[in-house]
Structure formats: structure tokens, C-alpha cells
Regions:
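Residue-level signal for inorganic ion chemistry
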Residues: 53, 258, 301
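FAD-binding subdomain of flavoenzyme oxidoreductases
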Residues: 139-214
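C-terminal helix-coil-helix/basic helical segment that borders enzyme active sites and/or dimer interfaces
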Residues: 33, 37-40, 300-333, 349-357
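Generic structural signal for well-ordered, non-transmembrane alpha-helical segments
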Residues: 26, 256, 292-299, 331, ...
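Glycine-rich phosphate/cofactor-binding loops in nucleotide/flavin-utilizing enzymes
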Residues: 352-402
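Glycine-rich flavin
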Residues: 45-55, 59-156, 166-178
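Glycine-rich beta->alpha junctions and the first turn(s) of the following alpha-helix
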Residues: 200-298
Length: 402
């Protein structure tokens, strides 16, 4: 099986499609799991593991094939992320984040795309934050500060989503009066990185802060991300926006955490006899019911999300258009999966008793990780309100996150 090294190659698209990245993720999972403690302690991916992920093509899952990427459809992509998350949530989180970022390549001119992604370690990361991009000759002057930059320790380039300001200081506006927001890309070496990622869970993502001050960004590294009219790549994947892949991928992280936690509890229940009890956990009727219900929750959430992605991808292949109804379905399935996964982890954690609190056992980190996933934008309860408004025929809020 050909190893994807990241630069453009002369292989056929069919060769890229033939690579079974899910199987490849399963093969690498034991290596990732063996690094899990080190990942958390370092608050980043170790260099050796990063190299293995680069060699396996895992940072380029959503990158166009024209640039040596896999250009995976949504469903196999989230299956890969789920498999990685079973081994380590921080690794899966970083891969999902930078994969979504790499979809920007579909909007860049070929030379600019090669400058960012052409090298094997051509990895792009970004985070949200305030700032502006002022129009100047040949490009823009960017001043901004960004946080939650997952994968930034692995990246060679960083990005910024900012409102455009004209030379005279007036904001550039769309016809409807809303601000024009573009994505600006620049080498990581041009930014000031600040270590702020001291958190409860997903410690290994290194989601630090970065800033730039009056940085000149050439116009060729500015794109109207997710604007269909600006796309140069026309594969099926890019009929979806990064928003749908972020939502689905982070839900897959949650489901991978839940699957691994529940499996670990089932293993524990075979032998553990709680203090004061006469039987093992697995012989306890309450535990039996809890395990069955947890399996049902996780299976239902997974079936909803994966089934929706398969059905919607097939429909988009025919129409080449992602409808609002389809975007709502992905939004609902993704947020639902995160909350069901959290419930499964909570059940397993509490049923494991005092065993779960020791760092040597596989429960406490996953408990912290899932409760960090749920705090991120993708887990917001507000998303249920948005979908509910739509289903009830009301004007939905929160369309920006669809």
C-alpha cells in the first residue's frame, strides 16, 4: 500500500481512493495509545508520532488529490477520526481540526495552495479571535489575536478569519449590509505564539493562542472560504463546507471516546468485585441494564450520524448542492452524538467506582476529555434550539454554525 507523503504526485485519483484509511487508523491506533500519557504530559503530539501521522497521510485526509491529499468523502473521514479517538482523543481532535482547515486549499490558486500544502509537513491550523485585515497595495495588513488553535503545534502555516477593512478604514460590506469576512493564511513563523493551554481535558491538542501585528499578507493567500463561486476544486467533498466536517468529525471524537470507555468498563466488570459485594460487576443487574442502555445510546447516535452522512452524500452526488434541510440534519446528528457519548462515558465512569479515579486506568482522562469536547461550540445545547425552530417552521437562529 502506497504511503502518502503529502506532496503532489502523479498517482491516479483511483489510487488515493483505494487506500483504506480506516484500516490504516486501526493499525496505528496501538502506537497512538502507547503515546497517550506522553501526549497529555507534553500538551502536544510527540515528534515521532507526528511523523507517523504525516507518513500515513492523516493530516491530508480532506486535502484535494491534486495536492497529494486523500480527499475522503465525509463518512470514511469521520470513521477514521472515530478510530483515532478510541486510542487518544487529543490526537483525533487535532487531525479533525487541521483536516477542516486544509479544505481551504480548494479555494486557493494552485501556486498558493502548493506553497502552503506542498511539503509533507504542510499543515494549516487556526482559531477564532478579534482583529481586522486592512486593504493595501498587493494584499492586506492583518492585526489580530486568536485562541483555541488546536493543532497549531503541528502546523507550519496559520490562518485567520477576519472582516475586511478598506484603505479609508471603512468596513467592506456585502449588499445586505453584513461584513465581508475572508480567510488569510501566513507562515507560522510570522506569528507570536503564547502558551495558554492549561486545561482539564484534551490537553494534548496544544490549542494555544497566536497573534500578528500589522502583518502583510499577499492577496494570493486570501480566500473567500466556503464561497462556492470561489472554488477551484470541484470534487464531491467540496460541495460540503468545513463546517459540516468539523461538526461530524468532533462528534466522531466524542463517539470514539465513548466507545473506548464503554469497552474498558465491560472488561473491568468481568473481574471487579466492589467492596462489600459478593459478585462481580457484570453479575449486577443494575450494571447489566446500564451497559445495555449505554450501548443503545451510542449505537443510536452513531447510526444517526453515519446514516445521515451516507444518505446526504449520495444525494449531493446527484444534485451537487447541500440543502438547508441536509445541513440541519448534520447539525442535529452531530450535536446529538456528542451528548449521547457524554452520557455513555458518565455511566461507565460512575459504574467503575473508585477504579475510575486513578490515572493508571483508562477512565479519568476520557472522562475529562469528553467533558471538554462537550464544552466546545459543537456541543452547544443551542444547536438543538436552532434545529427545533427550523422543524417548527420558525426562522432559525444559529445559521452561522450550519
Amino acid at each position: 500500500m502506497t504511503t502518502l507523503k503529502g506532496g503532489p504526485t502523479d498517482r491516479d485519483d483511483d489510487d488515493a481512493a483505494a487506500v483504506d484509511y480506516v484500516a490504516r487508523a486501526r493499525e496505528l491506533a496501538p502506537v497512538i495509545a502507547a503515546h497517550a500519557d506522553d501526549i497529555e504530559r507534553r500538551r502536544e503530539l510527540p515528534a515521532g508520532l507526528r511523523e507517523k501521522l504525516i507518513d500515513g497521510g492523516f493530516f491530508r485526509l480532506l486535502l484535494p488529490r491534486s495536492l497529494g491529499g486523500a480527499e475522503l468523502p465525509p463518512l470514511p473521514f469521520v470513521e477514521v477520526i472515530e478510530e483515532i479517538a478510541k486510542a487518544d482523543a487529543s490526537t483525533a481532535w487535532c487531525l479533525n481540526q487541521v483536516s477542516g482547515c486544509s479544505m481551504t486549499a480548494a479555494y486557493l490558486a494552485p501556486a498558493a495552495a502548493r506553497a502552503v500544502f506542498g511539503a509533507p509537513d504542510g499543515i494549516l491550523a487556526w482559531g477564532p479571535g478579534p482583529g481586522e485585515a486592512r486593504v493595501v497595495d498587493g494584499g492586506y495588513r492583518v492585526t489580530a489575536r486568536f485562541s483555541f488553535a488546536s493543532g497549531s503545534h503541528d502546523a507550519s502555516w496559520l490562518g485567520a478569519h477576519l472582516p475586511v477593512v478598506e484603505c479609508d478604514g471603512k468596513p467592506r460590506l456585502h449588499a445586505d449590509g453584513s461584513s465581508v469576512v475572508h480567510t488569510f493564511l501566513f507562515p507560522k513563523s510570522a506569528a507570536q505564539m503564547t502558551d495558554i493551554w492549561h486545561v482539564v481535558g484534551l490537553k494534548g491538542t496544544g490549542s494555544d493562542q497566536y497573534s500578528v501585528e500589522d502583518l502583510f499578507v499577499p492577496a494570493r493567500f486570501c480566500v473567500a472560504r466556503d464561497d462556492p463561486g470561489a472554488r477551484r476544486e470541484h470534487g464531491l467533498l467540496y460541495d460540503f463546507s468545513a463546517l459540516q466536517l468539523y461538526a461530524s468529525g468532533f462528534a466522531a471524537v466524542a463517539m470514539g471516546i465513548a466507545r473506548a470507555t464503554l469497552d474498558a468498563f465491560v472488561e473491568l466488570a468481568r473481574d471487579k468485585i466492589p467492596r462489600g459485594a459478593k459478585r462481580t460487576l457484570r453479575d449486577n443487574n443494575v450494571v447489566q441494564s446500564q451497559v445495555a442502555q449505554a450501548e443503545a445510546k451510542l449505537g443510536a447516535a452513531r447510526a444517526f450520524l453515519f446514516g445521515a452522512l451516507a444518505e446526504i452524500t449520495a444525494a449531493v452526488a446527484r444534485t451537487r448542492h447541500l440543502s438547508l434541510d441536509q445541513r440541519m440534519t448534520i447539525r442535529l446528528a452531530a450535536t446529538f452524538a456528542i451528548h449521547q457519548a457524554m452520557a455513555v462515558v458518565d455511566t461507565a465512569y460512575h459504574a467503575a467506582g473508585a477504579t475510575a479515579i486513578f490515572t493508571a486506568n483508562p477512565f479519568e482522562r476520557r472522562f475529562r476529555d469528553i467533558h471538554t469536547v462537550s464544552q466546545q461550540l459543537q456541543g452547544r445545547q443551542q444547536h438543538f434550539e436552532t434545529v427545533g425552530q427550523y422543524l417548527l417552521g420558525l426562522a432559525p437562529d444559529g445559521l452561522a454554525w450550519l
